[in-house]
C-alpha cells in the first residue's frame, strides 16, 4: 500500500490499551500509543496521514499527534498542545483539510476551540495559537463534533438533559439551526458524504439507545437503530456501512446502511472508545461529488504547491530518506507521505492503472460520484461487473432460457409453467388417489386408482353406489365394483325390486337381471355407465298415498256441508229496537234544573241508563224460545225492579218516551 491511493478501507480504533490499526478485512496490522489509556477523542488528516487525539489522564498536554501510516512498525507520537488552567474534558475533535485546522469541544468550559496545526512547532507558543470559536450556555454539555468540509458547516451534540439537541453552525461557530424534538442524550456524531445525512448515537430512557439521522439541514429525522442494553458512544461511516462503538460490552458493530437488520461485530476486546474509517473519503471518493469539487480542488492545489516548494513544508521528518517518486496520469505527489494522489480514473502506487481496466466484463465502465467504478451492462448481462448472463439460473426445473428483445424467457418442460417454470402443473397432492398426467393443452388430468373416480380421484367408487342397503365389493378379476343386493332387490345397483321381475314390464334390458343370466364382457363394460333408475307408476305405495288423500278430501267436504246446514237452521237472537220521541215541552239534559233525581240502578251495565238499555245477564245465559224472550223484555219494562226501566224526568213532568 502506498498512501491514499490504495482503495483498501483501513480502520483505526482507540482502546484503553492504545491505538489499533486494521486492514479492510478487520485484521490487526499494527498498533501504537500504548502509553495512552484514556483517549477521549481523535481526528484524522488524510493528506499527511496523521492522527490527532486527546488523553484525559495526561497531566501536561491536551492534544497529541501520531503517524498513522500502518506500514511503519513504530508510530511516532508528538505532543502538540499543552494544557492550561482552563483545559477541561475534550469530547469532540475534527480536522479541516482546507484550512488545516483542528476543532475541538470542551465540556467544562462550554466552548468550541480551533488551532492551525501547521503553525505548531515553529518556535511559536502553541497555547497562543488556540482560538475560541464560540461559547455555549452553561446549561449545555458539548459532546460529539463533526465537520462537513464540502459545505463548510460544523455539527455538534448537546447532551444536557434539559436542553439536549443537535446543532448546525458555520465554521465561525454561528448557530444556524438545531434539532430538539425527542432528543434525550446525544453523543457521537458523523457526516455521511455519500448520502448527505448526519448520524448520531443517543442514549434513551432506561436501558434503551438509538442511532438517529437527519439531512444536512438537521431535518427529516429517521431512526436507524433502536435497541436496548448497549451503550454506544461513537459512530463512523463509509460508502456501505455504519460503524458504532459499544463501550458496555467492548464491541464495534458494522451495520449495513441499506438494511439496519444486517449487522455483525467486527471487533471485540479491550474497551474501545472511538473509531475512524481511514478510507481516503475526502480526496479520492468525493472528487466527483459536485458539492465537494471546489473544496477538494483547493486542497489538492495546496498539496501540489507544497510538494513543489511554493508553500512551507511544515512538520516534515528530517530523517526521511529522499526517494524519487513519479506520479503518472496527472497524479499529484504528496510529499508528506511520499505517495501519489491520483485522478478519479486511475489507481495504483503511481496512478498507473486505469480504474476501469478490465473491470466490466460485458459492459461499459463509468466513474460514479464517489469515484468508484460502476458498470452499465449489455442487455443480456447483469451483476456488479456485468459478469453474469441474465439466463444464469433464471429458468427453474430444467427450463430452457432464451432471449426475446433482450428479455430472458423460459421454455418450460411438460410438467411446469410460469415465467420461470416455477409452478408445477401436476403437484404431489393434485390427484388424491391416482396418477397425474399433463394433457396436450397443458392441463392436468388424473388417472385414478382402482376403486376411485372423480376429476381428481377424490371419490371412492363404492360411495352411495349400491342402493337399498346393497353391499359394494370390488371384483378382483374384473377390477370393477359390484353390488351384493338383499333378498328384495336386484340389478347392478340393487335398484330393481324383485317383485317386479314377475310383472310384464316390457323392458328387455331388465330381464337379464331378473333371470339371473350372466352378462357378457361387452355388456359389463356398457353397464359401467350408471343406469337411470325408474319406478313403476302403479306401485303399491303410490296407491296408498292416493287413497289417503281422497279420504281426507271427502272428510273435509262433509264437515263443510254440516256447518252450513247447522247455521241455516239455528234460531237467531232477538233484536231490540229503541225509539226516542222528542216534544216541545221536553227539557234537554243540559238545561234541567239543578235539583236532580238520585237513582239507584242495580245490575245495570251502563250508568247512562236513560240513553242505553240494560239486560239481565242471568236471563241471557238461560236457553229460551223466541216468544219467551219477548215476554221477559216486556215484563222488565213495566216492572221497576227489572233490568231495564224508563226513568221519570227530574222535573216530574209527563214523559213521552215509548
Swiss-Prot record:
One of its GO terms (cellular component) is plasma membrane. The keyword Protease does not apply. The chain crosses the membrane at residues 544-564. The keyword Signal applies. LDL-receptor class B repeats lie at residues 100-142, 152-195, 196-241. It is a single-pass type I membrane protein. GO terms for biological process: canonical Wnt signaling pathway; oogenesis; spermatogenesis. Gene3D superfamilies: Laminin, TolB, C-terminal domain. Has a role in spermatogenesis and oogenesis. This is Protein cueball. It comes from Culex quinquefasciatus (Southern house mosquito). The lineage of its organism: Eukaryota, Metazoa, Ecdysozoa, Arthropoda, Hexapoda.
Amino acid at each position: 500500500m502506498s498512501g491514499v491511493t490504495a482503495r483498501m478501507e483501513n480502520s483505526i480504533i482507540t482502546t484503553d490499551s492504545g491505538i489499533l490499526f486494521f486492514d479492510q478485512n478487520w485484521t490487526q496490522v499494527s498498533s501504537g500509543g500504548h502509553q495512552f489509556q484514556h483517549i477521549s477523542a481523535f481526528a484524522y488528516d488524510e493528506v499527511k496521514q496523521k492522527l490527532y487525539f486527546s488523553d484525559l489522564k495526561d497531566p501536561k498536554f491536551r492534544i497529541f499527534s501520531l503517524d498513522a501510516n500502518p506500514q511503519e512498525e513504530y508510530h511516532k507520537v508528538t505532543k502538540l498542545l499543552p494544557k492550561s488552567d482552563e483545559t477541561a474534558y475534550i469530547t469532540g475533535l475534527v480536522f479541516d483539510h482546507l484550512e488545516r485546522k483542528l476543532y475541538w469541544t470542551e465540556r467544562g468550559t462550554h466552548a468550541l476551540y480551533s488551532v492551525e496545526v501547521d503553525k505548531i512547532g515553529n518556535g511559536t507558543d502553541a497555547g497562543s495559537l488556540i482560538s475560541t470559536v464560540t461559547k455555549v450556555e452553561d446549561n449545555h454539555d458539548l459532546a460529539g463534533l463533526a465537520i462537513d468540509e464540502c459545505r463548510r458547516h460544523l455539527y455538534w451534540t448537546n447532551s444536557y438533559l434539559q436542553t439536549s439537541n443537535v446543532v448546525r453552525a458555520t465554521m465561525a461557530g454561528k448557530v444556524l439551526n438545531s434539532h430538539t424534538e425527542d432528543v434525550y442524550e446525544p453523543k457521537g456524531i458523523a457526516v455521511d458524504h455519500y448520502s448527505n445525512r448526519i448520524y448520531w448515537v443517543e442514549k434513551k430512557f432506561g436501558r434503551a439507545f438509538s442511532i438517529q439521522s437527519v439531512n444536512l439541514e438537521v431535518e427529516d429525522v429517521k431512526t436507524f437503530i433502536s435497541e436496548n442494553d448497549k451503550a454506544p458512544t461513537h459512530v463512523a461511516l463509509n460508502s456501505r456501512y455504519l460503524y458504532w462503538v459499544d463501550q458496555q460490552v467492548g464491541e464495534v458493530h458494522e451495520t449495513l446502511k441499506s438494511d439496519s437488520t444486517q449487522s455483525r461485530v467486527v471487533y471485540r476486546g479491550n474497551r474501545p472508545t472511538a473509531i475512524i474509517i481511514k478510507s481516503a473519503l475526502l480526496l479520492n471518493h468525493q472528487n466527483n461529488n459536485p458539492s465537494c469539487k471546489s473544496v477538494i480542488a483547493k486542497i489538492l492545489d495546496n498539496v501540489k504547491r507544497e510538494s513543489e516548494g511554493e508553500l512551507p513544508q511544515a512538520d516534515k521528518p528530517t530523517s526521511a530518506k529522499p526517494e524519487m517518486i513519479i506520479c503518472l496520469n496527472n497524479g499529484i505527489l504528496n510529499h508528506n507521505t511520499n505517495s501519489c494522489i491520483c485522478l478519479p480514473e486511475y489507481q495504483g502506487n503511481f496512478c498507473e492503472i486505469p480504474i476501469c481496466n478490465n473491470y466490466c466484463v460485458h459492459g461499459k465502465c463509468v466513474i460514479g460520484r464517489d469515484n468508484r467504478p460502476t458498470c452499465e451492462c449489455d442487455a443480456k448481462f447483469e451483476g456488479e461487473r456485468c459478469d453474469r448472463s441474465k439466463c444464469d439460473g433464471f429458468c427453474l426445473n430444467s427450463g430452457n432460457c432464451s432471449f426475446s428483445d433482450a428479455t430472458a424467457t423460459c421454455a418450460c418442460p411438460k410438467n411446469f409453467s410460469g415465467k420461470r417454470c416455477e409452478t408445477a402443473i401436476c403437484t404431489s397432492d393434485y390427484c388424491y388417489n391416482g396418477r397425474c398426467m399433463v394433457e396436450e393443452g397443458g392441463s392436468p388430468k388424473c388417472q385414478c386408482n382402482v376403486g376411485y373416480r372423480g376429476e381428481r380421484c377424490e371419490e371412492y367408487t363404492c360411495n352411495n353406489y349400491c342402493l337399498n342397503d346393497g353391499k359394494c365389493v370390488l371384483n378382483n378379476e374384473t377390477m370393477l365394483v359390484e353390488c351384493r343386493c338383499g333378498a328384495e332387490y336386484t340389478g347392478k345397483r340393487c335398484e330393481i325390486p324383485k317383485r317386479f321381475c314377475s310383472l310384464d314390464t316390457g323392458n328387455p334390458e331388465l330381464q337379464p337381471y331378473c333371470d339371473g343370466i350372466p352378462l357378457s364382457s361387452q355388456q359389463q363394460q356398457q353397464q359401467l355407465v350408471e343406469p337411470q333408475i325408474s319406478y313403476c307408476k302403479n306401485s303399491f305405495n303410490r296407491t296408498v298415498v292416493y287413497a289417503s288423500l281422497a279420504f281426507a278430501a271427502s272428510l273435509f267436504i262433509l264437515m263443510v256441508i254440516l256447518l252450513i246446514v247447522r247455521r241455516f237452521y239455528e234460531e237467531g237472537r232477538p233484536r231490540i229496537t229503541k225509539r226516542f220521541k222528542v216534544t216541545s215541552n221536553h227539557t234537554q239534559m243540559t238545561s234541567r234544573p239543578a235539583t236532580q233525581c238520585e237513582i239507584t240502578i242495580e245490575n245495570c251495565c251502563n250508568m247512562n241508563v236513560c240513553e242505553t238499555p240494560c239486560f239481565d245477564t242471568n236471563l241471557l245465559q238461560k236457553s229460551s224460545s223466541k216468544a219467551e224472550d219477548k215476554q221477559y223484555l216486556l215484563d222488565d219494562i213495566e216492572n221497576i225492579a227489572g233490568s231495564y226501566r224508563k226513568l221519570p224526568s227530574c222535573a216530574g213532568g209527563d214523559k213521552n218516551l215509548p
